[in-house]
């Protein structure tokens, strides 16, 4: 709960009074910490899910979550998005076509108290492990473009720079020029916000690639594939299930992406490393 002595710096961060011990000295100082609040998704007046999230770019979050979860297939399927903010949380009032709402409310969700969640609440293992339509993108990038995108992503994380407590996701074109960056306490949320921002800007996600400051979990790979992003690069490792999904969905999955180094786990044809297969790099 926000104390009277705290002041908001920006929606994604707040200032707290802390006791810092460093180099054998202790002092009372002002420190920036990441903001986090419950965000309720309400479709056609019916509550659907509550996510713990950073209270920035919530319109992008509403659209991106709806697309990556398969609630709607196209941005125009969301008729109205209204954001209502309160002292301790926010609600996203979303209107979708009646037939979509009827299908949605058959799905039972249990997302309370989570910082992002990609598969929570599905009613069967089969529903969780569904494979999106296979990606057919002709995208190809080189390792310089990937390194350029990673550098730009690092430079465009103001909340992380202030607090050290959030994830970031970005989308870059084939030359590695980062067009969009979003931050959130939840890695899934950050990617959802990018997906929503792409849709709102009417940018074809298949013409570029996503970079994230987290591991590449199954949920992250699923969201990228569902959004028709053909390549996902993470600075940390993927999971085995994420690799299996990427192989089946036609997604190029890259891990340990740092500077000009990386490991390609699936569909390597989209990344030109500049060396022959088997040649020492």
UniProtKB/Swiss-Prot annotation:
It holds the Pfam family FdhD-NarQ. One of its GO terms (biological process) is Mo-molybdopterin cofactor biosynthetic process. Keywords: Cytoplasm, Molybdenum cofactor biosynthesis. Its main location: cytoplasm. One of its GO terms (cellular component) is cytoplasm. SUPFAM superfamilies: Cytidine deaminase-like. InterPro entries: Cytidine_deaminase-like (IPR016193), FdhD (IPR003786). The active site is at residue 117. It is found in: Cytoplasm. GO terms for molecular function: sulfur carrier activity; sulfurtransferase activity. The keyword Protein transport does not apply. The keyword Ubl conjugation does not apply. HAMAP family: FdhD. Required for formate dehydrogenase (FDH) activity. Acts as a sulfur carrier protein that transfers sulfur from IscS to the molybdenum cofactor prior to its insertion into FDH. Belongs to the FdhD family. This is Sulfur carrier protein FdhD.
